[in-house]
Amino acid sequence: MVSFGGLARKIFGSSNDRRVKTLRQRAEQITALEKNYENLTDEQLQAKTAEFRAALAEGKSLDSLLPDAFATAREAAKRVLGMRPFDVQLIGGMVLHERGIAEMRTGEGKTLMATLPVYLNALEGKGVHVVTVNDYLATRDAETMGRLYNFLGLTVGVIKHGLDDDERRAAYACDITYGTNNELGFDYLRDNMKYERAQMVQRPHNYAIVDEVDSILIDEARTPLIISGPLEDRSDFYNLIDTFIPPLAEEDYEVDEKQKTAIFTEVGTEKVEKLLEAAGHLKGESLYDIENVAVVHHLNNALRAHKLFQRDKDYIVRNDEIVIIDEFTGRMMPGRRYSEGLHQALEAKEHVTIQPENQTLASITFQNYFRMYNKLSGMTGTAATEAEEFGNIYGLEVLEIPTNLPVQRIDEDDEVYRTVEEKYRAIVRDIRASHEKGQPILVGTTSIEKSEQLAERLRREGIKGFQVLNARYHEQEAYIIAQAGVPGAVTIATNMAGRGTDIQLGGNLEMRVRQELSDVPEGPEREEKIAAIKADIAQLKEKALAAGGLYVLATERHESRRIDNQLRGRSGRQGDPGRSKFFLSLQDDLMRIFGSDRMDGMLQKLGLKEDEAIVHPWINKALEKAQKKVEARNFEIRKNLLKYDDVMNDQRKVIFEQRLEMMDEEDLTETVAEMRHEVIEDMVILRIPKDAYAEKWDIAGLKQDIASKLNLDLPVEEWAKEEGIAEEEFENRIKEAADKAAAEKAERFGPQIMTYVEKSVIMQSLDNLWREHLVNLDHLRSVVGFRGYAQRDPLNEYKTEAFELFQTMLANLREVVISQLMRVEIVGEAPPEPQLPPMAGLHIDGTTGENDFDEAIWAEHQHDDRIVPPAQRDPADPRTWGKVSRNEPCPCGSGKKYKHCHGAFE
């Protein structure tokens, strides 16, 4: 029976079809201009940029310039890159310009498509950011597409790990800036820890195109970017808490594998309360008293470490360290640590050295970072399954872009086996059969561990010449994945590895030229060798096509349909044939968690024998249903997290805006006077409550407050004896005395020095209190969920208490600032420049989950991001230097710039 909605779609087309139809008409208008642009000389084509900018200056809109700007960029691409954007790429480019997400199949040319809206929007001169998932892709795309932009008179910069502030500032000042989501986010956080606007590197956030948008805005949405600094060593406390968990019985806690939670039952809570009391760590009467917030937090972490995290699945122990394994890619992530004490709980569990916990100095989620852009768009091969989330959270509409040629890939039904062993035997048989007939095979696994297990099986079976993709550097990874289309190639890779690099049947010309001819200079010999490589690739492509094209063989389903679709999408690019198939077992995680017991019983009744598979569309539908459930749950988690993060985000905006205002202020006299008066008002109302009798006044306390907060000795006892004096008179007299003392100090210092001192004190105090506030919010967040048991809404409780904490922080700020300013005196030497605290930022690759810092250096020198004052550096010991700017004199005293001295060895 056909539903009414289905019938309507057949007659009128889906909303996606109708939108594509409208955009196709506009693409045809651009194509109609092609002949005119082909007739222009290079100089005339290049002059178009100035012409468009002049039109914008006269008030024309970007939309009105779109047809001509796209036609210009298309013609320039033909001349400079030898590539002509198809009409479907024009359609995708329009979607990106109109704040949408273009879902474009793998191999259809997303990178080239992006040049069209990038060129158009860069004409405004406000900056366009093209965001990729790793440094390799950012550099590659900036170099390749930079030729096109430079030809058209636009400047291009690239942000990558290892650049100093001057280099970053120059890259952000360009018309177009390529960079990773991590680098852009960290630069924003670092900028808002600087003390002068001139030190900042980023411009206002204008327009961003996010490549692999699903990976960045969905997969990484739960992981905030964090800049942190070390706290004191608390390893004894972690070890003590860890001893409480192993003796617990099953009735002491509840574990929900689906929800990934572990909580103490009432019985368990009583047990750990007694243990804490015996150890002298229980404050108050109950574990859940407010004084025990931090203890509860660490107990919950210890329980999660033991009951939710499995060794060799979620992490491995290597060289006396816990190394996290990424859940999406199965990759090890050296250098990355869980925050909020969870990593220390795992270290205590495995009895390795407990590293000091880090304090959050600044943090932001990708959700809130990218929502700062005036205009945001994205592109990916898989977004339709998450269209609702993109719409709800980012206001982005997903549009599926039709392929230039029909997709010929055959997606076969899943094969389901009863055990993992049976499944792997079938996989090896299938790989052997396809390999022997010369068909290239990409084998997708969910973890590095499983990749290695499969590789070992293939070795035992005598299958040789396969590649296992766990390269540490993205460039090597890109080369291996690019050659996965060679006839007979067997490439084992984790699901997301090598994303951003095409698998072309026969091999990748550009990669082979780079690999084989890197030392051959330009000239006839090089051209001859390139022609030979081209001919070889064409021949290999014919063989691969004859064998059926690329075969994507997946060894397990991921809990997200989107990750599965990404893997399938590696095959069948640009109309090539191909096939894909998933091999599953009832012991796989997804099957085990989502009702495989019932299915196992059914298969036994059907009399399924060993090594026999069940293949049926019903199985695919059942799995898809399970995946939809997981996706819906994950969406709810991310949506809920965003609601909590929005509370912090609103406060973050206030603090960062205040810092910017402070940087720009040339005279802070009025601001400081306001703060001083508010401190005095709070002080008086505390000690002399409104309308209270004189006997209730705390005059001794008021005198003490005036001395400690204002550094003044005032005769308040005498004032209190005066007839008819009220709190208002106290206020006015204290304000007058404090204002007079402040004015005298300002006169002694001089306006310039006074403003400098005020600015330094306010900003450093603000930063210190904000960091403490972030820790308080973390602890509040970790325990507020328990309010649900008392029938109170945890989110509302969090909002209320977070606001109270924020108000308290601002009151403390006023007191700290005024107390310091009323005491500060100038000594002979100039006051030191404000220094950033010791800090480190982890830069995690968006696709593979690896740390993009040089791992060896990062492991040995975790303090490299510290800003160390020159006076504290030992010329003979580079470990004391911290972060040194490339153009700074080398701290060793040689007189050379750092980059030409010790920096040359990095």
Swiss-Prot record:
Subcellular location: Cell inner membrane; Cytoplasm
Pfam families from the UniProt entry: P-loop_SecA (PF21090), SEC-C (PF02810), SecA_DEAD (PF07517), SecA_PP_bind (PF01043), SecA_SW (PF07516)
Chain residues that bind ATP: Q89, G107, E108, G109, K110, T111, D502
Chief location category: membrane
PROSITE patterns: SECA (PS01312), SECA_MOTOR_DEAD (PS51196)
Gene3D superfamilies the record matches: 3.10.450.50, Helical scaffold and wing domains of SecA (1.10.3060.10), P-loop containing nucleotide triphosphate hydrolases (3.40.50.300), SecA, preprotein cross-linking domain (3.90.1440.10)
Topology term for the membrane: Peripheral membrane protein
Gene Ontology BP, a term: protein targeting
Keywords in alphabetical order: ATP-binding, Cell inner membrane, Cell membrane, Cytoplasm, Membrane, Metal-binding, Nucleotide-binding, Protein transport, Translocase, Translocation, Transport, Zinc
Superkingdom per UniProt: Bacteria
Residue sites binding Zn(2+) per the record: C890, C892, C901, H902
Catalysed reaction, written as an equation: ATP + H2O + cellular proteinSide 1 = ADP + phosphate + cellular proteinSide 2
Cofactor stoichiometry and binding remark: May bind 1 zinc ion per subunit.
InterPro entries xref list: Helicase_ATP-bd (IPR014001), Helicase_C-like (IPR001650), P-loop_NTPase (IPR027417), SEC_C_motif (IPR004027), SecA (IPR000185), SecA_CS (IPR020937), SecA_DEAD (IPR011115), SecA_motor_DEAD (IPR014018)
Function: Part of the Sec protein translocase complex. Interacts with the SecYEG preprotein conducting channel. Has a central role in coupling the hydrolysis of ATP to the transfer of proteins into and across the cell membrane, serving both as a receptor for the preprotein-SecB complex and as an ATP-driven molecular motor driving the stepwise translocation of polypeptide chains across the membrane.
HAMAP family according to UniProt: SecA
Subunit relationships: Monomer and homodimer. Part of the essential Sec protein translocation apparatus which comprises SecA, SecYEG and auxiliary proteins SecDF-YajC and YidC.
Family: Belongs to the SecA family.
Protein's name according to its UniProt entry: Protein translocase subunit SecA
Species of provenance: Brucella canis (strain ATCC 23365 / NCTC 10854 / RM-666)
Gene that this sequence comes from: secA
